């Protein structure tokens, strides 16, 4: 008798074995981090999204088989393709988000993954993607989920301005703060050029069938308060981040 495995399950198992970060990037991870922007889900590593789709911080979910109810998790998102500095030739990184305090919830994503939630906003509040329309490449945005060290103590003042986030070295950060390898990862692309279009996207549903939505009211990060601002003229050099100020309440 022949047994057929549902294609969705096959795709999920294949995803577990494939690298979930861009080629050449470290740290690596082979487990997929589910990344959900409102009802738009990053189904495939490297998928292209419309800039507007990623305007707010995504929800996260991890394979239920990997969930440890006692574990606290940390989320990091990086842009790997910030245009070079004046006179430079190498693209740089930008820390778009570092959010601590994630814990497993009781909600399931399509019965296979557990939604995570945090009441914290920092130490580096979310900056949405915004690659310049004048750039020549689509930017790669990497999402990483780490087990959060109990002793981790990062002040919000460390990322008070966008300039403090440029050139962020995730490997050095991990070494200096005792952060172990990521448990899961994912990445997507956003192309700032007007002619760019998003590739296939999917919707995410919780076990009850309702579209996954954020739960709880985010509270202030407990680190030092700081203001994030982009000096006029700096925007074009970065990933197209609009002029804004985010106050860590």
Locations of the language-model features?
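Classical eukaryotic N-terminal signal peptides for Sec-dependent ER targeting/secretion
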Residues: 1-10, 230-232, 236
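N-terminus-centered regions that define maturation/targeting leaders and the start
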Residues: 15-223, 227-249
């Amino acid at each position: 008798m022949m047994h057929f495995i549902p294609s969705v399950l096959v795709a999920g198992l294949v995803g577990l074995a494939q690298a979930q970060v861009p080629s050449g990037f470290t740290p690596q991870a082979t487990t997929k981090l589910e990344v959900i922007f409102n009802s738009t889900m990053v189904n495939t590593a490297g998928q292209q999204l419309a800039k507007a789709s990623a305007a707010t911080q995504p929800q996260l979910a991890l394979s239920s088989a990997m969930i440890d109810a006692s574990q606290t998790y940390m989320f990091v998102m990086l842009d790997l393709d910030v245009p070079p500095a004046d006179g430079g030739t190498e693209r740089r990184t930008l820390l778009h988000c570092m959010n601590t305090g994630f814990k497993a919830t009781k909600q399931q994503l399509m019965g296979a993954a557990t939604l995570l939630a945090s009441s914290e906003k920092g130490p580096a509040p979310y900056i949405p993607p915004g690659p310049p329309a004048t750039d020549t490449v689509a930017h790669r945005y990497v999402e990483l989920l780490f087990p959060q060290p109990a002793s981790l103590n990062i002040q919000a003042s460390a990322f008070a301005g966008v300039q403090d986030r440029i050139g962020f070295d995730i490997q050095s950060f991990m070494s200096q703060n005792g952060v172990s390898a990521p448990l899961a990862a994912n990445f997507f692309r956003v192309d700032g050029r007007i002619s760019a279009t998003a590739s296939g996207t999917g919707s995410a549903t919780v076990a009850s069938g309702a579209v996954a939505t954020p739960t709880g009211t985010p509270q202030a990060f407990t680190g030092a308060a700081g203001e994030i601002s982009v000096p006029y003229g700096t925007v074009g050099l970065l990933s197209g981040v609009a002029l804004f100020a985010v106050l860590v309440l």
